[in-house]
UniProtKB/Swiss-Prot annotation:
<keyword id="KW-1064">Adaptive immunity</keyword>
<dbReference type="InterPro" id="IPR003006">
    <property type="entry name" value="Ig/MHC_CS"/>
</dbReference>
<keyword id="KW-0391">Immunity</keyword>
<dbReference type="Pfam" id="PF07654">
    <property type="entry name" value="C1-set"/>
</dbReference>
<comment type="subunit">
    <text>Immunoglobulins are composed of two identical heavy chains and two identical light chains; disulfide-linked.</text>
</comment>
<dbReference type="GO" id="GO:0071753">
    <property type="term" value="C:IgM immunoglobulin complex"/>
</dbReference>
<dbReference type="GO" id="GO:0005615">
    <property type="term" value="C:extracellular space"/>
</dbReference>
<dbReference type="GO" id="GO:0005576">
    <property type="term" value="C:extracellular region"/>
</dbReference>
<dbReference type="InterPro" id="IPR003597">
    <property type="entry name" value="Ig_C1-set"/>
</dbReference>
<dbReference type="GO" id="GO:0003823">
    <property type="term" value="F:antigen binding"/>
</dbReference>
<dbReference type="InterPro" id="IPR036179">
    <property type="entry name" value="Ig-like_dom_sf"/>
</dbReference>
<dbReference type="GO" id="GO:0071735">
    <property type="term" value="C:IgG immunoglobulin complex"/>
</dbReference>
<feature type="domain" description="Ig-like">
    <location>
        <begin position="7"/>
        <end position="101"/>
    </location>
</feature>
<dbReference type="GO" id="GO:0071738">
    <property type="term" value="C:IgD immunoglobulin complex"/>
</dbReference>
<protein>
    <recommendedName>
        <fullName>Immunoglobulin lambda constant 7</fullName>
    </recommendedName>
</protein>
<dbReference type="InterPro" id="IPR013783">
    <property type="entry name" value="Ig-like_fold"/>
</dbReference>
<feature type="disulfide bond">
    <location>
        <begin position="28"/>
        <end position="87"/>
    </location>
</feature>
Amino acid sequence: GQPKAAPSVTLFPPSSEELQANKATLVCLVSDFNPGAVTVAWKADGSPVKVGVETTKPSKQSNNKYAASSYLSLTPEQWKSHRSYSCRVTHEGSTVEKTVAPAECS
């Protein structure tokens, strides 16, 4: 079996182009983990977000580790009306959480 590998998590805020087009998508990129099972949870200001979430199935990378992405679709109003959004990834019992704050990149 492969050695266990904890995921590296990157959270991308909506781009300014996207906001100008009246859309806002947050992307949580989870990569280089093994075994290939992760749970992704989203939070807005610490409250769970269930609507507009889409998580891909983990796929095997060329290095035999796994990668997955989770997308959170918002309106620009929703994005701006919260202080922070977090993507929380649970893998093999350990949790990684990344947060973005709308105020920093408006």
